[in-house]
Amino acid sequence: MPRSLKKGPFIDLHLLKKVEAALEANDKRPIKTWSRRSTVFPEMVGLTIAVHNGKQHVPVYVTEDMVGHKLGEFAATRTYRGHAADKKAKR
């Protein structure tokens, strides 16, 4: 179920402060965050945000199409290595 409109979109306060500081300083370095639950705001467009996937920080360049989505959607947490090969087919 989607979030109520009267509440508005969620963003962690510490991430918002980092974004505002990067915009003010015109800093192009990636902003490191563990907040996968934060919503992408229009102010973030053009910034690179390093989102933690449980193992490492994945750099995500924010575009206009990403606004309204969650940061965690752009950093996959699981790797698919494929199913085991059929032993009979190898012979």
Curated annotation (Swiss-Prot):
GO biological process: ribosomal small subunit assembly; translation
An example Gene Ontology CC term for this record: cytoplasm
Coiled coil: none
Sample GO molecular function, one term: rRNA binding
Keyword Chloroplast: no
The entry's keywords: Ribonucleoprotein, Ribosomal protein, RNA-binding, rRNA-binding
Source organism superkingdom: Bacteria
Function (record text): Protein S19 forms a complex with S13 that binds strongly to the 16S ribosomal RNA.
Family (UniProt): Belongs to the universal ribosomal protein uS19 family.
Protein name: Small ribosomal subunit protein uS19
Encoding gene per record: rpsS
